[in-house]
């Protein structure tokens, strides 16, 4: 078993240089080995390649560009990460691909019947990438140059968002609740300033974002695709740009009555304050006012039932009971990057399944609105899964929204931990990208029941639970409408019709779905995830949510059934790319999924 837990006590430039040098040496050694092969079999060609991909279990170190408290380390690791991504291109050159193609067209056909289903599925899924050869009609050098440019620009975009923030200081008189959270700012002109500062901050990256979009389109053209969205959807459940646009249009038709209802409610609040035209910077404030009014449950009243340490422990215990795991904390200062980070060993009976890092408290060196899960190591013959759950909670008390977020991100971690793959590229997190959110959304909504809430906070009054769950369901029309705006913006960015970003582009999409109110300084630059590997991926939250609700419907009245929980683990969480996700869902449900559960929630 490879060493999968990294030493974070030394992230000096010297160590990073040594890691990069080792990576380059091993890459060149594998290239030389492959080019010298005369006997091409799975064991001589494919297995060494897979072992090589498993041998770089330092992805957790690259995450330190976002998580380490030392700014110098963050910057050094950001450069290391960029170099690492660019170096990946070196192994997949034409000479190496020629060897893979020779194997694919000769010996693989002979030995296919002797390979495991996992090996066959892997080869079918990745053989095009591994064995594609430049026949002289394709500009491989151009593709590689564009990939390097895209990666470099994406790193620049992310660095801008991670290291630079608006910093206007307001007086206590200007901030009604002492918070710069826009949903708590009563004075409209202050709300506008706060929103426009963030938009100015984000807009600084628009030319860079445009260049990334154009470079991706150039790559798509080189590959023979009409647009980048066609490339990005290859191998997904939804498959094509046309199918995705059809799904979004149908979703809009289905959701429009609820979007219009919620926007009308918000406009009425604004009119009561003398505001004739609701603007985007007004919405968070009136959204909170409406929820507080209907639930009569203040945030502070809600939060007092969820003290940080007790809540985290109770949530972890719920996952233990439901999935049949145990979590044990490992105390080793070298294995964490900050004293607030917890490292958990996950076991099933006495067998270690993997490890989960919890870096979930806001602190110096972390972006204030980060809520992520990253699988830094995937399951294989030589590795166990390692996940990092990265959130920015205040460490005092949880809101219910915080709790849902933690369930969601822990759901991703359990998806990774539960993998039974022997090839890392077939592990749970390599399922179709438009299914990967379904398990985490399952857990996010699993906690939306009185049974689970009473386990999280024993003794919580029933009327508080009623208020919390009512609050969680309010204004879903607006929330899904905003999701549709993001989906449409994502598709616009990555379509062949994209000519550049503009207020007109943003307004037309925003107005069609939410009915106007996009302020003239707001280019709606909420698309940074598009430049972090999420391009043409916004739709997957809504698409996978319909599947998550189907899975969740089986647990109605049986939320803590451990037998059912373990069957969910084995049939859904553990499978990953070992079989099509639809097959896993059908095996668990005992039927084809439909939109029944989703429509029930919407209505």
Describe the predicted segments one by one:
Residues 393-407:
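Short pre-active-site segment immediately N-terminal to the catalytic Zn-binding motif
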Residues 136-137, 141, 200-211, 218, ...:
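A conserved hydrophobic secondary-structure block that centers on an alpha-helix together
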Residues 1-178, 182:
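N-terminal helix-rich structural modules
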Residues 118-131, 148-189, 210-392, 436, ...:
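Active-site-proximal, well-structured secondary-structure segments within enzyme catalytic domains
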Residues 8-19, 42-46, 204-205, 244-251, ...:
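Membrane-entry segments of alpha-helical transmembrane domains in multi-pass membrane proteins
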Residues 34-38, 64-72, 193-203, 231, ...:
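Membrane-interfacial helix termini and the short, flexible loops that connect transmembrane helices
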Residues 2-22, 28, 34-36, 124-127, ...:
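C-terminal, non-catalytic "cap/extension" segments appended to globular domains
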Residues 60, 225, 411-421, 449-454:
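Long, well-ordered alpha-helical segments
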């Amino acid at each position: 078993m490879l060493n999968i837990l990294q030493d974070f006590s030394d992230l000096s430039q010297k160590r990073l240089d040594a890691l990069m040098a080792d990576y380059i040496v091993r890459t060149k050694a594998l290239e030389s080995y492959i080019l010298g092969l005369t006997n091409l079999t799975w064991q001589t060609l494919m297995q060494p390649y897979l072992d090589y991909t498993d041998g770089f279990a330092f992805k957790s170190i690259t995450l330190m560009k976002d998580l380490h408290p030392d700014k110098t380390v963050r910057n050094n690791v950001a450069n290391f990460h960029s170099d690492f991504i660019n170096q990946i291109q070196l192994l997949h050159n034409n000479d190496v691909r020629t060897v893979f193609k020779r194997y694919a067209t000769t010996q693989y056909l002979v030995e296919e019947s002797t390979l495991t289903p996992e090996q066959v599925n892997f080869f079918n899924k990745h053989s095009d990438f591994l064995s594609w050869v430049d026949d002289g009609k394709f500009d491989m050098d151009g593709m590689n140059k564009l990939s390097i440019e895209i990666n470099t620009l994406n790193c620049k975009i992310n660095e801008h968002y991670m290291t630079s923030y608006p910093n206007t200081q307001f007086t206590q008189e200007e901030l009604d609740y002492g918070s710069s959270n826009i949903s708590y700012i009563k004075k409209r002109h202050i709300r506008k300033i706060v929103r426009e500062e963030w938009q100015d901050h984000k807009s600084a990256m628009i030319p860079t974002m445009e260049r990334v979009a154009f470079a991706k389109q150039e790559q798509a053209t080189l590959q023979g695709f009409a647009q980048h969205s066609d490339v990005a959807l290859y191998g997904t459940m939804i498959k094509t740009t046309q199918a995705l646009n059809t799904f979004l249009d149908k979703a809009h038709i289905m959701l429009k009555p609820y979007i219009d209802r919620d926007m009308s409610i918000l406009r009425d609040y604004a009119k009561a304050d003398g505001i004739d035209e609701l603007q985007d910077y007004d919405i968070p404030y009136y959204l909170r006012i409406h929820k507080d009014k209907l639930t009569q449950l203040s945030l502070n009243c809600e939060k007092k039932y969820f003290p940080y340490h007790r809540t985290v422990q109770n949530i972890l215990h719920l996952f233990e009971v439901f999935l049949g795991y145990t979590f044990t904390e490992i105390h080793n200062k070298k294995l964490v990057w900050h004293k607030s980070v917890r490292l958990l060993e996950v076991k099933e009976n006495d067998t270690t399944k993997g490890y989960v890092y919890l870096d979930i408290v806001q602190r110096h060196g972390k972006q204030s609105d980060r809520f992520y899960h990253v699988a830094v190591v995937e399951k294989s013959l030589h590795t166990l899964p390692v996940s990092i759950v990265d959130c920015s909670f205040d460490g005092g008390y949880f809101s219910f929204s915080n709790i849902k977020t933690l369930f969601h991100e822990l759901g991703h971690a359990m998806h990774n931990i539960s993998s039974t793959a022997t090839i890392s590229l077939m592990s749970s997190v390599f399922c179709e990208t438009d299914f990967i959110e379904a398990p985490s959304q399952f857990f996010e909504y699993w906690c939306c029941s009185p049974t689970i809430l009473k386990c999280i906070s024993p003794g919580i009054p029933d009327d508080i639970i009623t208020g919390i769950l009512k609050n969680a369901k309010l204004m879903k029309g607006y929330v899904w409408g905003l999701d549709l705006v993001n989906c449409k913006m994502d598709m616009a960015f990555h379509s062949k019709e994209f000519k550049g970003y503009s207020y007109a582009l943003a307004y037309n999409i925003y107005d069609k779905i939410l009915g106007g109110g996009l302020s003239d300084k707001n280019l709606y630059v909420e698309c940074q995830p598009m430049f972090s590997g999420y391009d043409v991926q916004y739709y997957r939250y809504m698409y996978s949510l319909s599947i998550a609700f189907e899975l969740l419907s089986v647990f109605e009245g049986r939320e803590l059934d451990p037998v059912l929980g373990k069957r969910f683990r084995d049939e859904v969480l553990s499978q990953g790319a070992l079989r099509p996700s639809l097959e896993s869902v059908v095996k668990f449900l005992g039927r084809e999924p439909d939109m029944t559960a989703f429509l029930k929630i919407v209505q």
